[in-house]
Amino acid sequence: LGLSLDTNKFLIKKLLQQHGVPVPNYQLFNTPGDYLNPSLRFPLISKLNAIHGSVEITADAVSETEKHLRERLRYLIRTYRQPVLVEEFIVGREITAILLEGMNKKVYLAEKVFAHPEGKYVYLTFEDQWLSPGESAFRYVRYDDPLLKEYVKKAFEVTNMYDYGKFDVRLDQSGRYFFIDTNCNPAFGPKELDVALSVILDLYGVSFYEILKRLILNTVRDAIGKERLPLPGDRESEADDEALVDVEPAF
């Protein structure tokens, strides 16, 4: 279910909202001429509903007027032939959260420190994320807040994710969190490939090797959990249980 939800940002926003996870005010547009909910407050940011990876998140993604928003919607819907999610742009800091399962659910938080924070609207564009070398656009620093960790765990559960997930969160000037992106299948690889998951966990001393061990442990536990319950004297099932214990590292 988690993967099927991953290509519908609107549905994920609705699920999070219904379960008490804070999100910006939002609206889904199927056509450029759809009625604009008057409760939405500018500035507004437009995102493709079914595509991740910051595709079309450009310097022109934020609209201050309805005229500009309609032009943006017309371009995105006609080019990509899919609905567009429009939400209130949250001015403030941005935190990325990674949840990794092992023996339990562990949340790792990191703030994005932008190299050029002087702009009117500071956010990560497609170019920043994929075309800028190293830390020229931003870098991660450790961040901690028990409240945000609880929100992340709840978001992970209500969207039915498994193994790992990535969440982007904005923190406004009043100290309120808003979940702006949820991804159950983010880029995966070692930190040398500049992958957020590994870069952030490396800040906490968790290597890519350790990440792989935890994921393998999850897979083994899931596989054994789906087998029939062991019968008394069933040596094959007992051997499977012993094998599971043998592969469990101390996290």
Where are these regions (language model features)?
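Residue-level marker of alpha-helix boundaries and capping positions
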Residues: 2-3, 63, 143, 188
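Active-site nucleotide/adenylate-binding loops and adjacent lid/helix of ATP-dependent enzymes
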Residues: 3-85, 91-92, 149
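Short, structured loop/turn "capping" segments at alpha-beta junctions
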Residues: 23-24, 82-84, 105-108, 162-163, ...
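Short beta-strand elements
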Residues: 44, 101, 112-114, 183-186
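Short connector loops/turns at beta-strand edges and beta->alpha or beta->beta junctions
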Residues: 49-51, 131, 185-187
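Phosphate-binding site of ATP-dependent enzymes
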Residues: 64-150, 171-178
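ATP-dependent carboxylate activation and anion-phosphoryl transfer catalytic cores
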Residues: 142-251
